[in-house]
Amino acid sequence: MADNLYDSSIIEKQLKEKIENALSIHSYPTAIFFSDKLLNLVTIHSKEYVKILYILCDALYLDRQFQRSSYLIQKYLNAIEEIDKKGEDYQYIDDIHSHHHNQQQNIFYKRIKKEKEDEQYTNTILKLKYLAAKCKIETNEFDQCLQILNKDNDSSENMDDENNNINNNNNKIKKENEINNDNCDDDDDDDDDDDDDDDDEKDSNQLLKFYTNSKSNKSKDISENNSNNENTTKESINKNNTDSSSIDNKNNNKNNNNNNNNNNNNNNNNNNNNNNNNNNNNNNNNNNNNNNFNKETLIIRSSISCLKGKCYESMDNLKKAKFWYIKALLTDYNCFEAFESLTKNHLLTYQEEISLLEKLKFSSDDSWIKEIYSLSLKKYDSPKFTFNYKYLELYDSLNHQNSNNNTFGANNNNNNNNNNNNNNNNNNNNNSNNDISTEDLISVKTLSSSSSSPSKKQENNNLITINEIRKKLIECNDIQTWISEYYFYRHQFQESYSITKRILKQDKYYSNQICLMVNISSMFELQLTNELYFTCHQLVDSFTSSLNNGSHGGSHGGGGGGSHGGSSGNGGAISWYGVACYYHLIQNSDQTQRFFTKSTTLDSRMGASWLGFGHFFASKGEHDQAMAAYRTSSRLLTGCHLPLLCIGMELIRVHNLNLASQYILQAKDICPYDPMIFNELGIIEYKNSQYNEAIKLFETALEICKIKSKASSSSSSSSNYHNLNLSNISFSGVGSSGIGNNNNNNNNRRTTTTTTTTSNNQKKNSSNNKTMIAYLESWEPTIYNLAHCYRKLRKFELALHYYTMSLSLLPNNPSTYSALGFTHHLQGNFDEAIDYYHQSLSIRDDTFTNVLLHKALSLSILQYD
């Protein structure tokens, strides 16, 4: 019997459907099976072959067969390189094509050369390189990953051109003429040469400025090309028109009575114009397709740059990692992975983060993305950058609305809300032109064909305000996490803990590093030992279970398990970091050191663990080990000021004041908005007996605290959040009122309210007062230090005032009672001094206070005698 005949196109179509169905249900072995068969049916080195190869390797990647996936891709890429090298004289070595003739080889090479000129083909090749590099990252082969990515000749040439342009743009400035053309080169020798590492160290603002200029120049070139194309088409149309008019004139000169011929000519001219317009429309469609391919190319190149940054970061080359992350973002600002790596790992300073965000050219429809990006920046209160306050204000207002709903009855709330909504709708209808601008409206409608024009009612339904977008997005876990981080930076630990606790309760497998770290640190600050123990126990269990699953999955597919353990290493590091915090909280030193060591061993690039390790050594008085941990943290967190500040504080403790001031000033350059920096500088001046300078620094720290408190209290005035009248708190010294009086004098801490205030407002005011007072309590040591300075200058009245203020913020502090007694002692008020000494000793026995008490008693007896 004769063999049955099959249609190859039908078989290919059926196989594609089987592959799509298998991928849709995540049956990766099935997809691998059919894509392997389809790959052998398709003509080798064709566009279709490359697409199927990518589908096969992508399925292998998803099935955790990383080595096989990267091997197949590299094998194909090496074959393409051989074709490029040998050209038309290339003789294919493959056994399948060994019988081909030279003429067939030439045809084969020409077809390959033609296909390489296709942009879609080149994009698929880039995607293959990206996938192969991803496989190498999963197997922790970072050098080979860079070798695969650096084979892209276009990118290396672009890097050389960019470096040359950097030097050309900086010829006017002498300091910038020393920049070499080999900055951020992709050669393998760069990792071994210190000179090349020094070449990578340059100002990030200069980098951002260059890339924005280069992108604008490229856009200008594109616009010029488009305008030239339009001009050429217009000229061709005009030429046709002029030619037709000349023909008409000749016909009119020959036969003036032949009007029909003229009409026919005009019709022909109109037809020609219509044909030209159709050609222009086709050209526009082609341009749109090219723009889509250009966007895809930008996305792929941005992902490749981000992958290079991850490789360099894993190799502890943070300078190059920062370079490639920035380049990825400037290529495509939608590459959140690069943005998250820069912000989460503190590779940029706060000023660099702001400048980077301003350089990213967000479209008008993506302005809401810029707000979310700004929320993930460092949580410093810069007076020059308030773009991230929108979500914070909304969160505060929603909290107060929830408190209102919990206080009043549900029926009353529904009626009030309905009335308010009706009133708001009427007001919005009356004042729509004033309240909502065109910039606040974002269209979320999908693109439709030009023939089907939507009605005005549909367009209005598709337009929403930016506030409505915020209200919907504020429930996202990552936005809630960034808000909790903001409260943690402001020492409002209860609020940050409640937010992260709610997130982890709703999504117990939410593995965001920032959320887990804020949750653990908040429990540590609040001294919630039971909650911290339970949370860390859950984290360790989830880490061990994921590690066991990873080792099981690694046996299938060859060498995948080790990479999964590496990815889980970060989660394990956070788990053991939490365990170390728990033992540090219950003062078990041996277990604390053991689990901090375990955390830093699992993830040696986790700067927070090294910072906590340094705090532990500092609390035990082990100066050298604390300094080593702080220096490691400073090397990892290059854009964070806290490690430098901690180094300075540790040097103050060992009385190395000159070196301490240098480190703290470096921290000030990174973050000039942290009051702790000015507090530590004030301590240095105090120890140097420069009391007036110390007073200025302490007052600067307290002024920053007051500005922060005002910013948060006035951030949502509609929700009555500013219940504390912080302007009554005088940090300058003279004529102060408020916290410095008695604990029961709450009137000085609040704004004047009307007599018709409801009980709900009183409860809300008291809760907000507690929040603001809790924030001010964290800066009680600064007020205490300020009182010391005034006592040293023998300004006893001001010293007593600030000691009293310190005592109101932190009651029952024996040191403050002793300081108050000693100040009265110096004034000769021995009876008051004796009372304060007794109050101090009733809380804590202290040798120095006992000595002062005996002296005060003897002096008071002599005074009465």
UniProtKB/Swiss-Prot annotation:
Pathway(s) annotated for this protein in UniProt: Protein modification; protein ubiquitination
Organism: Dictyostelium discoideum
GO BP term (any one): anaphase-promoting complex-dependent catabolic process
Chain spans, region Disordered: 153-293, 403-436, 738-767
Stored InterPro entries: TPR-like_helical_dom_sf, TPR_rpt
Pfam families tied to this protein: TPR_10 (PF13374), TPR_12 (PF13424), TPR_8 (PF13181)
A GO cellular-component term linked to this record: anaphase-promoting complex
PANTHER family recorded: CELL DIVISION CYCLE 16,23,27, CELL DIVISION CYCLE PROTEIN 16 HOMOLOG
Keywords: Cell cycle, Cell division, Mitosis, Nucleus, Repeat, TPR repeat, Ubl conjugation pathway
Function: Component of the anaphase promoting complex/cyclosome (APC/C), a cell cycle-regulated E3 ubiquitin-protein ligase complex that controls progression through mitosis and the G1 phase of the cell cycle.
UniProt keyword Nucleus present: yes
Known partners and oligomeric status: The APC/C is composed of at least 13 subunits that stay tightly associated throughout the cell cycle: anapc1, anapc2, anapc3, anapc4, anapc5, anapc6, anapc7, anapc8, anapc10, anapc11, cdc20, cdc26 and cdh1.
TPR repeat start-end pairs: 11-42, 46-75, 88-149, 300-331, 336-359, 366-438, 478-506, 515-542, 573-602, 607-635, 642-670, 675-709, 777-809, 814-843
Subcellular locations according to the entry: Nucleus
Protein name, as recorded: Anaphase-promoting complex subunit 6
Family affiliation: Belongs to the APC6/CDC16 family.
Disulphide linkage map: none
Keyword flag Cell cycle: yes
